């Protein structure tokens, strides 16, 4: 998927939480309806079979309950995408990344080959369709998630290049696939954040740690030999830069990928470097943008949502710019794009009881015109407003309401923007108030009451969301209708 990811270490966040967030985007010309659901342990089969690659993977028999963001329309696989399991481990997958011919020639992707000329089919490897479903129900820490996925990659291979984030209350790990069977993972520094467009991102890797103490780096068992035997290390000083060894620096990266990383870093560290002009330290086409940075202040969920909604505001590249030099307007791929399917931000809070530790902030459709809303993840079911998505357009579905608001507000941008801004602030304020109240109620409640209170809280938040979303839909529909080309100023007498 064409996505954007941001990861925030616990000492870089406002309350000590670890936060992982990703926009899940459809490919150009497509929109994928999504839903927010709970997957129970008994729903997992003994053997998983991929729709795309036909690979069959036996599953352990000790699955945990998990939340997920699967496709709402069946037929093309599960695509669980993002979720939290009952052990308070979060995962988001995947960020499609890039590679280069040297890597792909040395370790080709494992692509499904259909039966032909009397020969049986050859299954492919695992991919984005499968990864969350194969890993999240069976792990109890972020590090354990890296190791399980790494083992699956080495055994079954993959047919695509992907980046995957794992999180618990203490750690965040980022794994990137390398060719068909290799991989590397790096622990996000606690005091830093990471931004990831659709490009291999890790820019430094300590092989000695990965093959020694494994404190901050992990990798496939033969990665050192793979690098040596295929002359992949391009450094002059012996310090491996994985971005040079395994990644890409194509012209397409400079309009599709690097500008997104540049804008996020520029927004969160505006004074650390010079970001604009001919003397800039980093520009939108720079290949050496840092993988991680220490922010200039602690980051909030709202900061994460802003950068994942961005479209180069305040730069010459904003597609909605109505002033200044417009020659570069829309030159680069926005983060908040028309084909955002959903955004999920998983927050692991250290200062509350474990049963309310995990909060999932969910948004649907184009982030430039939506709002995110928080829900407790430790539940048996999710609110129908977020779970009832089908292929049929309906105002009873938050996904479809968000799609309609986005399309109408885009077409009436100048008049509708104020309604979208008030909608987002109103939902965030009201849902935070409800979350704060229920945090207190649940913390002081008897154990037998807590599960019901978590679901009651989610229901109350969804009801408030639905009311405000319906009101905003009404407002942007009015603005767009008022600007129709067949409008006429004179009314009947």
Positions of PLM-derived features:
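A contiguous strand-loop segment
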Residues: 2-128, 148-280
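Glycine-rich, aromatic-lined ligand/substrate-binding cores of catalytic
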Residues: 225-351
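Short Pro/Gly-enriched beta-strand edge/turn motifs at strand-loop
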Residues: 60-65, 146, 322-330
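Histidine-centered catalytic/metal-binding microenvironments
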Residues: 424-493
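Substrate-recognition/cap regions that form aromatic- and gly/pro-loop-enriched pockets
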Residues: 313, 317-444
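Short, well-ordered beta-strand elements within core beta-sheets of diverse protein domains
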Residues: 132-138
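Short, charged, surface-exposed loops that flank catalytic or proteolytic processing sites
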Residues: 138-144
């Amino acid at each position: 998927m064409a996505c954007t990811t941001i990861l925030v270490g616990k000492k870089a966040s406002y309350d000590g939480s670890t936060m992982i967030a990703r926009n899940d985007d459809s490919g150009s010309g497509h929109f994928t309806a999504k839903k927010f659901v709970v997957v129970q342990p008994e729903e997992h089969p003994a053997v998983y079979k991929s729709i795309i690659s036909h690979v069959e993977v036996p599953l352990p028999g000790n699955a945990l309950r998990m939340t997920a963001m699967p496709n709402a329309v069946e037929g093309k696989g599960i695509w669980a995408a993002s979720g939290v399991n009952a052990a308070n481990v979060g995962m988001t997958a995947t960020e499609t990344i890039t590679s280069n011919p040297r890597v792909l020639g040395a370790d080709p992707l494992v692509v499904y080959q259909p039966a032909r000329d009397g020969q049986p089919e050859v299954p492919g490897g695992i991919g984005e369709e499968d990864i969350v479903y194969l890993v999240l129900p069976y792990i109890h820490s972020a590090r354990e998630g890296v190791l399980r996925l790494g083992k699956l990659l080495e055994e079954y291979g993959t047919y695509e290049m992907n980046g995957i984030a794992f999180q618990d209350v203490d750690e965040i790990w980022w794994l990137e696939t390398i060719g068909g069977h290799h991989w590397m993972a790096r622990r996000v520094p606690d005091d830093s954040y990471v931004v990831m467009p659709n490009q291999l991102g890790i820019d430094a890797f300590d092989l000695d740690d990965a093959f020694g103490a494994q404190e901050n780096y992990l990798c496939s068992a033969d990665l050192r030999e793979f690098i040596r035997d295929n002359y992949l290390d391009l450094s002059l000083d012996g310090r491996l830069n994985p971005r040079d060894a395994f990644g890409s620096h194509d012209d397409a990266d400079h309009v599709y990928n690097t500008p997104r990383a540049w804008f996020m870093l520029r927004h969160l560290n505006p004074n650390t470097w010079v970001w604009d002009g001919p003397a800039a330290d980093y520009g939108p086409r720079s290949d050496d943008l840092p993988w991680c940075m220490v922010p200039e202040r602690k980051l909030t969920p709202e900061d994460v949502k802003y950068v994942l909604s961005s479209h180069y505001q305040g730069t010459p590249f904003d597609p909605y710019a109505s002033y200044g030099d417009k020659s570069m307007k829309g030159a680069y791929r926005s983060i908040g794009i028309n084909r955002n399917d959903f955004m999920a931000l998983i927050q692991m809070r250290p200062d509350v009881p474990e049963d309310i530790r995990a909060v999932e902030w969910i948004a649907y459709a184009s982030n430039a015109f939506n709002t995110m809303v928080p829900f407790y993840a430790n539940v048996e079911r999710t609110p129908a407003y977020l779970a009832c998505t089908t292929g049929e357009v309906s105002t009873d579905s938050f996904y479809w309401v968000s799609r309609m608001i986005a399309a109408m507000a885009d077409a009436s941008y100048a008049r509708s923007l104020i309604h979208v801004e008030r909608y987002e602030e109103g939902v965030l304020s009201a849902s935070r108030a409800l979350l704060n109240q229920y945090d207190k109620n649940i913390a002081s409640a008897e154990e037998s009451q807590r599960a019901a209170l978590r679901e009651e809280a989610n229901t109350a938040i969804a009801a408030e969301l639905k009311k405000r979303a319906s009101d905003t839909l009404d407002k942007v529909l009015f603005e767009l209708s008022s600007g129709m080309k067949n409008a006429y100023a004179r009314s009947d007498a």
